[in-house]
């Protein structure tokens, strides 16, 4: 192929782009590439989740979908004139600040959301409100690049279990529910995290949002279709769980498990999605040749007319974007370099009336404290032979990979056979959970976090204090204490933990002595 022939398509492409668009596009491309490079770790983590996690595999389709959405609007948008716009810098600054807070709190989802919103803010700052209005839906759809949804798993597990119980009752299958565990004559079943239905739900939300924009014009129809896309996967997952248990009663658990993975995993939800699409088909009110945007409305919009005068030179906007990045990344780097002093070792504390014992748990329980600088796990037994387990961890800082209250950390370790059953009885300044392992074995766990003068069972309160410390460039250690007891001992688990707390004295002082900070 001759060099001249290879250059022809590029030349034709440039001819299609008006001259007044070429430099702004280069500025935008440069800004986006620089942001992706600077926050590459977050984009790499997102891409890793898209590829490795079946919950987020559907996001691999989002970038080409966004490209297609842009292509459908491009010819009309090129009729507009891009211009710098200073309110876009406010959006960008907010996103950069959110990224820094997410970095301080070790919240990857906050950093990843911020990385996406920074691209949107840069677009606003460099292209202006009129171009942004024309590209509003593709810009909004970029939010689906953020792998979010795992936070819904506990709620969806509980909801699926309740739907399953209703369906079992309607089908006259006797069953007993205990949290997310269901016992029937066929066996003992758990609505596990993988069976929560979160994969189908978040994929359906992304799909429904796309269809609502592309296939509908009226907002009532869009809202109705989105409602169907929210309700249907939740109910369908309940049907899936019920069907698995019902089949287990006829053919056995092993057959039901295989059937679940093959039919429900690959076929059932495809059928449900097709049925939702078929149900909505006759209500589509956008003709196939309708333009995706009415560019005349965008040009005549009174709202955009009021916003557009807030202009800023594009070079000035680009410089301001760079300055904001330097400010927040530099601030975060200084905070990340700070570490609190922690003891070289933690002494095993004596507890009056209790003595150390070897592990005698009916089912192994090992809390997870990833990234902790010091940790202890001990079992104390009283004169009656009843035991309380103590898990203590100390961190010199809170950040990604060192999160006292991070996902899958603490009393319900990620990847274990333990599952959350219900909230436990109230304990002062603590979070109380009943967890369950196969057997079943029931265990009460009371979690408390300590940093500075704060003692709480709330992960949110801990995060807020940790974030404040980082904002003020203040370093303080963070400790987590979990007191736990199995049910089925000489006394109920809550009574055992209360007795143990009475023996150790004030919990804050006990935690501080172990951390050597008082």
Regions found by a protein language model. Give the residues of each.
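Hydrophobic N-terminal alpha-helices or hydrophobic patches in metabolic proteins across all domains
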Residues: 2-518
């Amino acid at each position: 192929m001759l060099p001249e022939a290879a250059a022809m398509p590029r030349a034709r492409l440039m001819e299609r782009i008006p001259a007044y668009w070429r430099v702004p596009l280069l500025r935008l491309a440069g800004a986006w590439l620089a942001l992706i490079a600077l926050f590459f770790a977050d984009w790499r983590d997102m891409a890793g989740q898209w590829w490795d996690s079946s919950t987020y595999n559907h996001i691999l389709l989002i970038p080409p979908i966004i490209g297609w959405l842009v292509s459908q609007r491009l010819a009309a948008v090129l009729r507009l004139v891009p211009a710098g716009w200073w309110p876009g810098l406010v959006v960008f600054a907010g996103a950069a600040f959110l990224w820094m807070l997410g970095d301080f709190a070790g919240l990857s989802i906050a950093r990843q959301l911020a990385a996406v919103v920074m691209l949107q803010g840069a677009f606003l700052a460099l292209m202006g409100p009129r171009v942004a209005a024309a590209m509003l839906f593709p810009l909004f759809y970029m939010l689906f690049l953020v792998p979010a949804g795992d936070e819904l798993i506990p709620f969806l597990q509980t909801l699926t279990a309740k739907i399953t119980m209703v369906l079992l009752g309607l089908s006259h299958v006797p069953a007993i529910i205990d949290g997310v565990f269901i016992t029937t004559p066929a066996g003992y079943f758990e609505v596990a995290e993988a069976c929560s239905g979160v994969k189908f739900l978040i994929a359906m939300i992304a799909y429904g949002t796309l269809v609502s924009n592309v296939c509908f014009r009226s907002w009532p129809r869009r809202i109705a279709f989105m409602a169907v896309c929210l309700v249907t996967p939740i109910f369908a997952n309940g049907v899936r769980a019920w069907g698995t248990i019902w089949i287990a009663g006829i053919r056995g658990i092993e057959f039901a498990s295989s059937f679940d993975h093959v039919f429900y995993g690959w076929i059932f939800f495809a059928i449900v999605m097709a049925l939702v699409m078929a149900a909505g088909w006759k209500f589509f009110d956008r003709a196939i040749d309708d333009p995706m945007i009415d560019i005349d409305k965008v040009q005549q919009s009174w709202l955009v007319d009021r916003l557009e005068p807030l202009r800023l030179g594009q070079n000035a906007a680009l410089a301001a974007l760079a300055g904001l990045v330097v400010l927040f990344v530099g601030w975060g780097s200084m905070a990340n370099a700070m570490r609190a002093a922690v003891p070289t070792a933690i002494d095993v504390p004596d507890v009056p009336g209790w003595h150390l014992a070897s592990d005698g748990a009916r089912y192994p329980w090992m809390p997870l404290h990833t990234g902790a600088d010091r940790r202890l796990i001990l079992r104390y037994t009283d004169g009656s032979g009843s035991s309380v387990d103590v898990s203590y961890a100390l961190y010199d800082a809170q950040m990604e990979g060192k999160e006292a209250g991070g996902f899958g950390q603490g009393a319900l370790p990620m990847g274990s056979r333990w599952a959350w059953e219900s909230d436990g009885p109230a304990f002062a300044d603590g979070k109380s959970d009943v967890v369950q392992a196969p057997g079943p074995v029931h265990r009460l766990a009371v979690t408390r976090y300590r940093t500075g003068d704060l003692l709480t069972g709330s992960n949110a309160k801990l995060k807020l204090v940790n974030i404040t410390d980082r904002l003020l460039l203040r370093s303080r250690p963070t400790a987590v204490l979990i007191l736990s007891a199995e049910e089925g001992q000489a006394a109920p688990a809550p009574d055992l933990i209360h007795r143990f707390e009475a023996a150790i004295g004030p919990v804050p002082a006990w935690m501080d002595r172990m951390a050597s900070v008082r």
